[in-house]
Design a protein with these regions (language model features):
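Membrane-embedded translocation segments of transport machinery
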Residues: 189, 196-347, 354, 359-409
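Membrane-water interface regions at transmembrane-helix termini and the short interhelical loops
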Residues: 2-8, 36-48, 68-88, 141-148, ...
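Alpha-helical multipass membrane-protein architecture
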Residues: 39, 72, 82, 93-97, ...
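Alpha-helical transmembrane segments of polytopic membrane proteins
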Residues: 53-61, 149-154, 237-238, 324-327
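Flexible loop linkers connecting adjacent transmembrane helices
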Residues: 2-6, 39-45, 72-91, 116-143, ...
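Helix-loop-helix module between adjacent transmembrane segments
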Residues: 7-17, 21-31, 64-67, 103-107, ...
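N-terminal alpha-helical transmembrane segments of multi-pass membrane transport
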Residues: 1-135, 253, 276
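Transmembrane-helix boundary/entry motifs in multi-pass membrane transporters
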Residues: 5-14, 49-53, 83-101, 132-134, ...
Length: 409
């Protein structure tokens, strides 16, 4: 009971109340008038694409460069904590939680669907003179997919966690988003200005969670529909969201060392089992070759891609893909960054940056290439059918891939 009272004493009651009421109002609006919410989202999409696309692209690119460079400066040897502190979690637990925090339903949802979508249409096909659905288009499709899940996205998480970890563990400030702005606004972080900063961070995370839960609900519902032939209703999808939310809440309430650590380690073992199955059941030689060639292709193209701005007036493709991804990564930044800081106390800045960027990117690339190369091979050299599956229902793409593997059990 004393622990509960101690935790409650740290809660900002006015901010929590205001935030809760605003979230309830926003969710109520979604249920009562989803068309209005769609129009609101479409308006902001157009506004960002038309006026801020270049700015967003450059900010993410420069954040990536800065975050990676700081690891190799003298500051890289500083610890996120006192100089004699050591990490709380083992490297395996740390890596598992990092991977689980930043990659969830999205990488499963888009692992097949994204490269197959890019195989049909993307602006780089005309730039490089490649025909849709060709082998050259497959290389470009894999490259773009890796770019969207690569260094740039993870740097958006890492920089937030780095700022929070530094100011919280070395300067004694609260582990909240407002602390990252202490060098700019000083002690105003303890007043209304700080509350507004945290409020914006909460809403940013809300939008990120909305996208992730939507993708996850669609993925799980489509899987059940595909396997059992049942018709999925909106109420069923809502039930899926509620179940996932309850599991996540129980995990958080049970604490880092129990719930979240257990789920993260279980998650990474399940990922390894599924990866191994696809690797050996699929075109193994093609996958292994793609792991090498795809990674090298990404390394050679990541800088020009990071600064590429869609020159078209409508920016339809970049709005649907690159700008969507960068907005999604940034929206999750406050939450994931804070979590990264929480589990990284005692590690050096160099270890933190490399651990929160290089390791998740490497694991993510293995996943994306194993699934992506398998899907592209099935479409180009196998029975085909994935283009039609993605165009019909993007959430069923991964299940159609399993079926087309045609494993003889």
């Amino acid at each position: 009971m004393q622990k509960i009272y101690a935790r409650l004493s740290l809660v900002n009651i006015p901010l929590t109340f205001v935030t809760t009421m605003m979230v309830v109002c926003f969710l109520s609006l979604i249920f009562m008038n989803p068309e209005l919410v769609d129009e609101f989202a479409a308006f902001w999409n157009r506004l960002i694409a038309n006026y801020f696309a270049g700015y967003l692209i450059w900010v993410v690119a420069l954040v990536t460069i800065f975050t990676l460079l700081i690891a190799f400066t003298p500051y890289g040897s500083l610890r996120l904590g006192k100089d004699n502190e050591r990490p709380e979690f083992s490297r395996f637990s740390w890596f598992s939680m990092l991977f689980g925090a930043g990659v969830g339903t999205g990488i499963l949802f888009f692992g097949v669907a994204e490269p197959i979508s890019h195989l049909q249409n993307n602006p780089f096909l005309s730039i490089e003179g490649a025909e849709p659905l060709s082998s050259e288009a497959a290389v470009i499709a894999q490259r773009i997919t890796l770019f969207h899940w690569g260094l740039n996205g993870w740097a958006c998480y890492s920089i937030v966690g780095l700022c929070l970890g530094y100011f919280s563990y070395r300067k004694g400030l609260p582990l909240t988003i407002r602390s990252a702005l202490h060098p700019i606004i000083g002690d105003k972080i303890y007043g209304i200005a700080g509350d507004l900063i945290d409020l914006v961070a909460v809403f940013s995370t809300l939008f990120g969670i909305t996208v992730s839960l939507g993708l996850g609900a669609s993925q799980m519902s489509s899987g059940i529909e595909y396997l059992f032939g049942t018709t999925i209703t909106p109420m069923f999808k809502l039930s899926v969201v509620l179940v996932v939310s309850i599991i996540a809440t129980v995990s958080v309430v049970s604490g880092l060392k129990r719930g979240i650590k257990f789920l993260s380690e279980t998650n990474i073992w399940l990922c390894l089992i599924l990866l191994s199955f696809i690797l050996f059941a699929g075109p193994t030689i093609v996958i292994l070759s793609s792991l090498f060639s795809g990674t090298l292709d990404y390394i050679s193209s990541v800088i020009p891609l990071s600064f590429w701005v869609d020159p078209s007036i409508e920016k339809t493709w970049s709005t649907s893909w690159t700008l969507f991804y960068w907005g999604w990564w940034i929206a999750w930044g406050p939450f994931v960054g804070m979590f990264m800081a929480r589990i990284s106390r005692g590690r050096t800045i160099r270890e933190y940056v490399l651990g929160t960027i290089i390791f998740p990117v490497a694991i993510g690339f293995i996943w994306l290439i194993v699934f992506g190369a398998t899907a592209l091979h099935i479409q180009s050299s196998g029975p085909g059918g994935l283009v039609e599956a993605v165009n019909e229902d993007i959430s069923q793409a991964v299940f159609r891939t399993y079926e087309l593997l045609n494993v003889d059990w």
